Amino acid sequence: MNTTPRIGLGVDVHPIQPGRPCRLLGLLFDDADGCAGHSDGDVGAHALCDAVLSAAGLGDVGAVFGVDDPRWAGVSGADMLRHVADLTARHGFRVGNAAVQVIGNRPKVGPRRAEAQRVLSELLGAPVSVAATTTDGLGLTGRGEGLAAIATALVVPTG
């Protein structure tokens, strides 16, 4: 039996949609516009989903949730993470730990970092660290046109 831990990487980018609620890292931010998308536009949760799925060899968010499947329309990033954690467990892995970095100007993640880490860790059943950065005015995130996130995850075989 293979007992080697596996590492995955996930990236997500969405454009800002003025007036849409901002859901990020499993939290609601009242002081910023949210991202457009088939689901809730939570780039942090989506990047984490991709990282876990890729580590477990289960594809990516598009393969699991689709981009136009009505069953997943408007689904929260939190529900997506729950589903990914369950799917990963059914395929013989558990999340060991994960990290996610949000790239954008707003919302400010720092003041709610501990809350986001707690929520995401509960959803995945493993420690999740959260970081944020800007691009110093460069690109779509720097101009405030979108948000991006990159994540890594370690999964461990349970067998």
UniProtKB/Swiss-Prot annotation:
Recorded metabolic or biological pathway in which this protein acts: Isoprenoid biosynthesis; isopentenyl diphosphate biosynthesis via DXP pathway; isopentenyl diphosphate from 1-deoxy-D-xylulose 5-phosphate: step 4/6
Binding site for 4-CDP-2-C-methyl-D-erythritol 2-phosphate: D12, V13, H14, H38, S39, D60, V61, G62, T133, T134, T135, D136, R143
E.C. number(s) listed in UniProt: 4.6.1.12
UniProt keyword list: Isoprene biosynthesis, Lyase, Metal-binding
Keyword Cell cycle: no
Superkingdom, taxonomy of origin: Bacteria
Residues annotated as binding a divalent metal cation: D12, H14, H46
Pfam annotation, one family: YgbB
Cross-referenced PANTHER family: 2-C-METHYL-D-ERYTHRITOL 2,4-CYCLODIPHOSPHATE SYNTHASE, CHLOROPLASTIC
Described function: Involved in the biosynthesis of isopentenyl diphosphate (IPP) and dimethylallyl diphosphate (DMAPP), two major building blocks of isoprenoid compounds. Catalyzes the conversion of 4-diphosphocytidyl-2-C-methyl-D-erythritol 2-phosphate (CDP-ME2P) to 2-C-methyl-D-erythritol 2,4-cyclodiphosphate (ME-CPP) with a corresponding release of cytidine 5-monophosphate (CMP).
Name of protein: 2-C-methyl-D-erythritol 2,4-cyclodiphosphate synthase
Organism the protein comes from: Mycolicibacterium paratuberculosis (strain ATCC BAA-968 / K-10)
